[in-house]
Amino acid sequence: MNLHEYQAKSLFAEYGLPVSEGFACDTAQEAVEAAGHIGGDMWVVKCQVHAGGRGKAGGVKVTGDKNEIRAFAEHWLGKNLVTYQTDEKGQPVAKILVESCTDIANELYLGAVVDRASRRVVFMASTEGGVEIETVAEETPELIHKAIIDPLAGPQPYQARDLGFKLGLNPTQLKQFTKVFMGLAKMFEDHDFALLEINPLVITDEGNIHCLDGKIGIDGNALYRQPKIREMHDPSQDDAREAHAAKFELNYVALDGNVGCMVNGAGLAMGTMDIVNLHGGKPANFLDVGGGATKERVAEAFKIILSDDNVKAVLVNIFGGIVRCDMIAEGIIGAVKEVGVTVPVVVRLEGTNADLGREVLANSDLDIIAATSLTDAAEQVVKAAEGK
């Protein structure tokens, strides 16, 4: 689950971190009034969506004219913002963040992730602020400095100072940076973050550290113990198919191919997508139906997959462990009949009663292709998607 920038900055403020005064507004009039409440003669107005690249897409504006604030809000509220991180439809803009304008002398980067390789929370800092960290990692990895947090000892001030020295901060800025670092580390643990980014973390003209942006991703598995964070969820930013799948405990991620994939087990699902690619196809989705491939769940999975108009064929790859393959085959047949599937369906079954399962499919009188192996399944579904 992701948070909006205004929500992230609200959490920053709770932990005593330096952020700009700002208000999230639902209407153009509120945006104008917010600028008046903030005061000053320059403001920043930003569309609030769960995507980066807003500035290049026209979703951020610096202005000293309240009429321009009104025009900006009227233009974007209720519309979709398309950036390089969204699909072609973009993300809906329901709020505009109005903030005081901050003078920038230098831009830095500070972020943290749960690193699977080290099995630790890892903080990253760089002098290349305002640039996508992935770009920095690819082009100039030596400019990314890391601090690995020991889960027993916790974050230490010396780690912040070490990063600060590498960023070229002066003694006053080091103290401020240490406060930001320690606050973010505590926030990361308190709220079960999976990702945290401040890009850019700026040094103002007065020489002070300031959090100019905020990006937060929450570990979805921990939301049950984060009631406050759950209330911040904005369902309008979710993919409609992914949200529907979650209601049925299906793990679905939309992709841009034409081969629908339905698999039980995340590892097998990724392997299935790989072999479809290997044989010249493009997966339209990742979909893990989990351990219980029942008729009801398979039917919902078909509905979700086929709601994508790009899908020209579906590959069902099921390993029957606890659930017998003949029962799975009957569930697939029932689901195909219930949903009224019109595209070719290729099914590969392995595991308990696999031969019986394939026999059940063959005797179904439905347009279901029973594959003999995963390679055969991939070849068959790619041909079917191409209309061959």
From Swiss-Prot:
EC number(s) on file: 6.2.1.5
A Gene Ontology biological process term: tricarboxylic acid cycle
Reaction equation(s) it catalyzes: succinate + ATP + CoA = succinyl-CoA + ADP + phosphate; GTP + succinate + CoA = succinyl-CoA + GDP + phosphate
Pfam families: ATP-grasp_2, Ligase_CoA
SUPFAM superfamilies registered for this protein in UniProt: Glutathione synthetase ATP-binding domain-like, Succinyl-CoA synthetase domains
Pathway note: Carbohydrate metabolism; tricarboxylic acid cycle; succinate from succinyl-CoA (ligase route): step 1/1
Subunit structure: Heterotetramer of two alpha and two beta subunits.
Protein name: Succinate--CoA ligase [ADP-forming] subunit beta
Organism: Shewanella woodyi (strain ATCC 51908 / MS32)
Gene: sucC
